[in-house]
Amino acid sequence: DFVALSDVCDVETATLLKREVSDGVIAPGYSDEALAILKTKKKGNYCVLQINPDYKPRLVESKEVYGVTFEQERNEAKITTDLFKNVPTKNKNIPAAAQRDLMIALITLKYTQSNSVCYVKDGMTIGVGAGQQSRVHCTRLAGNKADIWWLRQNPKVLNLPFRDDVRRPNRDNAIDVYISDDYEDVLPDGIWQDLFTEKPEPLTREEKKAWIAQLHGVALGSDAFFPFGDNIERAHRSGVDYIAQAGGSIRDDNVIETCDKYNIAMAMTGLRLFHH
């Protein structure tokens, strides 16, 4: 996995990258101090790439499939807050922070394999469902990832009594299992002792459900319209309060009605962001 930066890599970013697992980084530039830090990662084998910040891709993209070449214009759509002016729901309040999150969601979707749905919270992408044949499958997949992100912030998880000699990747893997339905895999005698100083109490299904119910203020973007209200039902369970989607379904009324049921503010952008 590579880290892609849109600005010059500074010392703070390089210090953060040094402790995170990745195969390389690409950026338009690096400060001398940042480059010196990155050179020490992976014993000097960390891949550091610099891209020309003035590079502009071709306006026409092409793809060859079994000898047939397909061409189309590159997606140059500008994602701005102007896309959020058409709000057909009863709740029309989309504050500035939510508009920022919706923009992040749509920008993410612009470069994500369709069909795709993206959840964003506090300026961070917390769940992406991509490459699915069904829109609701995208919403479920991204919602499940958003739930995992939130569960990792549960006090029981934050206070897991890890041994000092357990490395960060192993801690991360243990947390992933601990918050899943397979939590017993890290808690039996003979296994928990390798990870923890004392045996943790499990995070029960009821506790997880109650914790997820506390998640609010999530923004969701979709790369095309929602055909049914079931997408909204699933999104609501992961704390979604703001939605941006293209609109244009013959069942838009049902989708709007479901948003109103949960007081969700939804903008219809009129913009499809399909990417194949």
Which residue stretches match the model-derived regions?
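ATP-dependent carboxylate/acyl-activation modules
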Residues: D1-Y242, S249-H276
